[in-house]
């Protein structure tokens, strides 16, 4: 039997760790830095050693209407080796915008405390991500099929899954459920507790930007947080990154300049046009953002193999005044900390950031249409090119809004 005191102990422990994590991980409002970047997912499999079983549960495509009776299979991962079958708690991870196996293998806190609290671990995949995609590939070509990608529908999926598990797993009927999540998954965990209090006794929402919406949070907050992660190491580091945008713009205007950029940064693809330069700048923006996010005080393979305090390592190359090609060479050395710390990369691919593309199609629709957050474009010490603000919805997300009309 798990007492209320034990559950409170989970929250006390988690709050302390969450506060530390928020401080170390560039703090934050977590990590929706520009029009494309979202919670990252590794391109490599995570060999965590965690043991779990994979199951599928038949879900309704539409929980709130009567016209659509279609169903899909929702994937969920279950680990019961630590569980007390006499009412031990259920720790339920509210899946993010990506493959649930990656989150399962990178949420060590849940695994660490499962043994202490004798908990059943459940990791539920979010609809339209990973393997849990209603209508398959057609979902991303037909707006009528994609219409059911909402947080409300996902929360209803989680609620139905929990009810199913508690009714079919012997000993689970009286088990208290605690929701866990980070980033968008943390938002879902918090909303899950709010919307379904009879199902979830509490939620631990790590780095969840539940207040990062218009009229609540200043739109400059995110970049200010990312900037501070670099500024703590060196003011000159921030100045050099800020100066680099105009330098890249200048080189990107000519064929010779674009060729030089490709050579200096050892890019796998040529920069043939201004659109390629824009992709290159997006890639750099995501790099600085991801570095701030994984600025842990210990070595990690979370996104890429990285040293402890990777922002500090990057800023070692950007802490002295530099101009023109000298600054470009320093930038290359800095981003190589992220992309080539092992020294095994022969070239750098601007179409990858140490994150998989499994969730990109769903998130590129979901975020601008359903989760319009204030975005940080104007902060003076920015790590993004200010010109991107003008293009944000015109070239990036505007086409998605047509789908919502």
Task: Name every feature range the model reports, one short phrase each.
Residues 352-404:
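Small-residue-rich helix-loop
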Residues 128-144:
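Glycine-rich "HGGG/HGxG" loop immediately N-terminal to the catalytic nucleophile
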Residues 6-120, 131:
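Catalytic-loop region of hydrolases
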Residues 98, 127-130, 210, 226:
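Alpha/beta-hydrolase active-site loop signature
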Residues 171-183:
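Alpha/beta-hydrolase fold nucleophile elbow
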Residues 91-93, 121-124, 178-180, 202-205, ...:
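Structural recognition of the beta-strand scaffold that forms the well-ordered cores
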Residues 145-168:
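Alpha/beta-hydrolase active-site loop
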Residues 188-365, 369, 373:
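Alpha/beta-hydrolase
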